[in-house]
């Protein structure tokens, strides 16, 4: 007991700030020499000093100053708070066995070996020694823990009850209490400044054992001391836990997470749509989440499309066609192009019921637009939106547009289109035979050639140049084979445009030159006047052209009324020249005739321009006697012309011998000829 007190008296001397590292080294030697002499009989003194210490609280010394948490201890390891406090309850609870390690820890306050009893000097050398000694004490604690201490005692930290205070001059009576202060509750030390121990230069360790050399300078952050092997295993365990994926959630949790994800996505997109702004991608989401969102968005788009189409089908059922589908609902919807849009694409949160689906040429509905859509019924899902195929002809598209908008324009364009597309008509057998008789007059080798055409032109008194004859034959060659056969001849004689051009030319015969385009109509008109064709052929040809003229006149009136109504509705300015170009030939003929009647009618009643001109294909039934006399005179002139200019074969073709073939003595011929006016030259 006295020997121990003599060892503790130098503490009062070491409390002064002038103590240097030499005293610390000497005290360390004393500690190492006195360690084996400590016995278990000192427990009584320890208990007594502990009770006195509880009655008289002493200002905290160097250990408390060392245990103060510093900035370096916060950045460093946190191993020390879980180790040194574990040594304190061991000294208070385990009894004599724990006191065996007491002398190792209880050292004079001037020494720098004991971790709880050493002060923190103001000099830099003492600071370095303090760090080194703290590491040494931890090594000693590690050796003690290996002697049989349990992990339960090692894992109990002690609460911190006081803060570090500056050192005070201790009395000799207080110098003998370091072993008692180790057993009272001490503040939990921080991580300490031993972190910087390997980097700083420390004084040489006197009498360091091999066990202390093997101890690690830095302890792990788990309760209780660990070796390098333990730290390696802990690092491997942490790496394994970090690499292992989390356990898969339960099905109920997955459903709940999916619902929450869908609701969050809808709310986020609704907020973006309301704000009208679109930012970049919020955060990277998983691949499966993106797939689920795309699937939900596609479902919502299909339902919204079906609903809008069903509402449109109820309003206008004539524009859609009912299609029965036995497959799933998605089969009755036109397949949309599968394009992966940005997940942050802004779209309206809900589609109003009055919004019509876009036309085939417009922009499709974006797929990333989930919204509140009402469920559709099975009846609405059976309706399919009609697909309009694009038309290649602009004229057909214009015609279809006018058909939907203007009925008058529709009838007008339909009439004009049918009039243009009408190339040839289906003739009856009698009409075809009548035109065959006219074709045989040219007496060509199965076709109309230049020689036969010149002979007929000489017969009727027309003067054409060879170039004009060739031009007439080329215009009559419809199929372009270089020959004007009966088929080409029939197509020319039934052409409506050529016919009305010929009628107009006959009206304006003194003002217009000869037209090779209508030469065959001019020849036919003169032959009818001269009665050069058989009676049945004349009747069939006359009836055919009268019907054509009547149909053309009615169509001209319809065209005029339609154009007038359209002009009044759209207020189209009247342009006489443009109207003249757009008029059909029938209307132009009627307009010219009406204008001729109005000009100088009272002054010149006998003028041919004041009356309806004599058209062979339109016979008049009045003044029979005058016309009979003119017909007989015309017949004698034609007989003289044929007998002098044509051969006997051609003359016999027109006038056959005998009473039945003679036109002069036929009563029926005279009756028909009485209705035909004569054309004067």
From Swiss-Prot:
Residue ranges, compositional bias (Low complexity): 319-335
PROSITE patterns for the chain: EF_HAND_1 (PS00018), EF_HAND_2 (PS50222)
Name the record gives this protein: Spermatogenesis-associated protein 21
Sequence ranges of Polar residues compositional bias: 83-94, 159-173, 264-281
Occurrences of domain EF-hand (ranges): 464-499
Keywords (A to Z) from UniProt: Calcium, Metal-binding
UniProt-listed InterPro entries: EF-hand-dom_pair (IPR011992), EF_Hand_1_Ca_BS (IPR018247), EF_hand_dom (IPR002048), SPT21 (IPR043520)
UniProt region (Disordered), positions on chain: 1-284, 298-336, 653-681
Task of the protein: Involved in the differentiation of haploid spermatids.
Keyword 4Fe-4S: no
Disulfides per UniProt: none
Binding site for Ca(2+): 477, 479, 481, 483, 488
Gene Ontology terms, MF aspect: calcium ion binding
UniProt superkingdom: Eukaryota
Start-end of Basic and acidic residues biased regions: 1-14, 251-261, 662-671
């Amino acid at each position: 007991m006295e020997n121990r007190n003599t060892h503790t008296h130098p503490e009062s001397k070491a409390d002064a700030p002038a103590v240097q590292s030499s005293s610390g080294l000497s005290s360390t030697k004393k500690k190492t020499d006195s360690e084996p002499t400590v016995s278990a009989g000192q427990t009584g003194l320890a208990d007594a000093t502990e009770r006195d210490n509880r009655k008289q609280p002493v200002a905290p010394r160097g250990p408390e100053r060392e245990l103060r948490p510093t900035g370096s201890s916060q950045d460093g390891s946190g191993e020390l708070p879980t180790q040194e406090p574990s040594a304190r309850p061991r000294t208070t609870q385990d009894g004599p066995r724990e006191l065996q390690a007491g002398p190792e820890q209880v050292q004079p306050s001037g020494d720098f070996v004991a971790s709880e009893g050493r002060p923190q000097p103001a000099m830099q050398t003492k600071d370095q020694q303090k760090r080194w000694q703290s590491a040494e004490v931890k090594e000693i604690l590690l050796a003690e823990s290996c002697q049989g201490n349990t992990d339960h005692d090692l894992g109990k930290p002690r609460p911190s009850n006081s803060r570090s205070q500056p050192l005070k001059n201790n009395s000799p009576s207080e110098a003998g209490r370091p072993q008692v202060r180790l057993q009272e509750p001490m503040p939990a030390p921080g991580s300490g400044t031993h972190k910087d121990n390997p980097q700083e230069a420390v004084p040489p360790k006197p009498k360091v054992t091999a066990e202390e050399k093997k101890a690690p300078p830095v302890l792990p952050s788990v309760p209780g001391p660990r070796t390098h092997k333990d730290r390696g295993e802990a690092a491997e365990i942490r790496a394994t836990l970090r690499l292992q994926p989390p356990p898969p959630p339960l099905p109920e949790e997955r459903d709940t997470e999916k619902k929450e994800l869908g609701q969050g996505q809808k709310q986020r997109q609704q907020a973006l749509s309301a704000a009208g702004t679109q930012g970049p991608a919020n955060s990277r989401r998983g691949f499966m989440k993106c797939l689920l969102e795309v699937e939900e968005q596609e479902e919502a788009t299909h339902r919204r499309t079906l609903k809008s189409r069903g509402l449109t089908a109820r309003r206008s059922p004539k524009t859609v066609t009912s299609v029965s589908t036995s497959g799933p609902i998605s089969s009755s919807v036109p397949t949309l192009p599968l394009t992966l849009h940005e997940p942050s694409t802004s779209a309206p949160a809900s589609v109003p019921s009055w919004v019509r689906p876009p036309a085939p040429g417009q922009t499709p509905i974006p797929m990333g637009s989930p919204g509140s859509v009402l469920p559709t019924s099975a009846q609405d899902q059976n309706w399919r939106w009609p697909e309009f195929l694009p038309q290649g002809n602009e004229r057909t598209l214009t015609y279809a547009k006018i058909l939907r908008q203007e009925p008058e324009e529709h009838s007008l364009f339909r009439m004009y289109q049918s009039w243009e597309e009408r190339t040839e008509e289906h003739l009856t057998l009698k009409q075809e035979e009548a035109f065959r008789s006219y074709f045989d007059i040219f007496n060509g080798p199965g076709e109309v050639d230049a020689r036969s055409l010149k002979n007929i032109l000489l017969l009727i008194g027309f003067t054409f140049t060879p170039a004009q004859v060739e031009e007439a034959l080329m215009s009559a060659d419809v199929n372009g084979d270089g020959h004007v056969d009966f088929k080409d001849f029939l197509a020319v004689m039934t052409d409506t445009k050529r016919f009305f051009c010929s009628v107009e030319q006959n009206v304006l015969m003194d003002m217009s030159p000869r037209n090779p385009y209508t030469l065959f109509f001019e020849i036919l008109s003169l032959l009818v006047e001269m009665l050069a064709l058989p009676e049945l052929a004349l009747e069939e040809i006359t009836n055919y052209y009268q019907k054509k003229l009547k149909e053309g006149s009615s169509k001209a009136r319809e065209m005029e009324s339609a154009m007038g109504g359209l002009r009044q509705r759209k207020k189209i300015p009247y342009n006489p020249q443009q109207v003249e170009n757009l008029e059909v030939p029938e209307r132009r003929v009627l307009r010219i005739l009406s204008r001729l009647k109005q000009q100088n009618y009272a002054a010149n009643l006998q003028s041919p321009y004041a009356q309806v001109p004599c058209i062979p294909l339109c016979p008049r039934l009045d003044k029979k006697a005058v016309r009979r006399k003119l017909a007989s005179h015309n017949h004698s002139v034609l007989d003289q012309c044929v007998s002098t200019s044509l051969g006997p074969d051609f003359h016999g073709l027109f006038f056959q011998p005998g009473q039945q073939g003679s036109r002069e003595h036929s009563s029926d011929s005279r009756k028909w000829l009485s209705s035909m006016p004569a054309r004067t030259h």
